[in-house]
Structure formats: structure tokens, C-alpha cells
Amino acid sequence: MPQLDKLTYFSQFFWLCLLFFTFYILLFNNNNGILGISRILKLRNQLLSHRGGEIRSKDPKNLEDILRKGFSTGLSYMYSSLSEVSQWCKTVDYLGKRRKITLISDFGEISGSRGMERQILYLISKSSYNTSSSRITCWKNIMLTHVLHGQGSIIS
């Protein structure tokens, strides 16, 4: 914007006022503007302060219902995932038998404490050992091992 001179002073002042008044009308005098948002926030705070006692009295039961629904949803999701993985393992095993190769034959879970790690690893290696002449392209068993005491993890 050039410096204000006597020839363009009026037009610059006119456009400056027009822009500022337009922004003022859009921001402050409209219900969706800044003043409208502040009115909505004040009303919301008043409603929450009046209903605060009711919400607190119903909170434990609602919280228990929410937790129960969340746990049941998580449990059903876990079981559906487990059934899908088991179905996938069966399908892969069936396809492997048709092609005369061993791919995946089992999906299981072993739970134990940290003291049982060596025994679990021995059982996994013993069950996945194959003496036949067919080539093994993947582990025979896929096992999820959970260590109860949380001191370490076993991945197989």
C-alpha cells in the first residue's frame, strides 16, 4: 500500500473502513460469530452447573454400564479375531495338504510363568520338528506364549 498522499487518501480510507466494518459485522454481530460462541459457552456452563448434581449421582451406574459394554465388545472382538485366525490356519493347512507341503497346522496358546520358559521352548521346538522328507516352508505350530509374571516375553 503506497503512502498516503492527497490524491489517493480518500479511496484508501474508504476501502479501509469498508473492510474493517465488514469484518466487524461478520465477526461480532452475527449469531455464529465470536459473540454468538461466547453466548453459547455461557449457556452451556450454566446448564452444566444446574445439572451437575444429577450427573454425579448417576455416574457410578453409567460408568459400570459403559465398562461392561466395553469389556463385552472387546471380548467379542477378541473371540471373532481368534475364530478368523483359526479358520485361516485350517484353510492354509488344507491348501498345504493339497500341494503336499506342510505350512501351518495348529493355532494354540500356552500360558506359564517365567520359570517354565525353557520347558515351553523345548515343547514348541519338539512339536514343530518334522522328520519327513517334505520341505517345511513355515512353522508347523504358531503359538502365543503369555508369561504371567510379566518379567519377560517369549516370541515363537
UniProtKB/Swiss-Prot annotation:
UniProt-listed Enzyme Commission number(s): 7.1.2.2
Disulfide bond entries: none
Tree of life domain: Eukaryota
Swiss-Prot/TrEMBL keywords: ATP synthesis, ATP-binding, CF(0), Hydrogen ion transport, Ion transport, Membrane, Mitochondrion, Nucleotide-binding, Translocase, Transmembrane, Transmembrane helix, Transport
Membrane topology: Single-pass membrane protein
Pfam families: YMF19 (PF02326), YMF19_C (PF06449)
Biological process (GO), any one: ATP biosynthetic process
Membrane spanning stretches: 8-28
GO terms for cellular component: mitochondrial membrane; proton-transporting ATP synthase complex
Keyword Transcription: no
Subcellular location: Mitochondrion membrane
Catalytic activity: ATP + H2O + 4 H(+)(in) = ADP + phosphate + 5 H(+)(out)
UniProt cross-references to InterPro entries, sorted A to Z: YMF19, YMF19-like, YMF19-like_N
Gene Ontology MF, one: ATP binding
Function (record text): This is one of the chains of the nonenzymatic component (CF(0) subunit) of the mitochondrial ATPase complex.
Family of the protein in this entry: Belongs to the ATPase protein YMF19 family.
Subunit (UniProt): F-type ATPases have 2 components, CF(1) - the catalytic core - and CF(0) - the membrane proton channel. CF(1) has five subunits: alpha(3), beta(3), gamma(1), delta(1), epsilon(1). CF(0) has three main subunits: a, b and c.
Protein name from the UniProt record: Putative ATP synthase protein YMF19
Annotated organism of origin: Triticum aestivum (Wheat)
Gene transcribed to yield this protein: YMF19
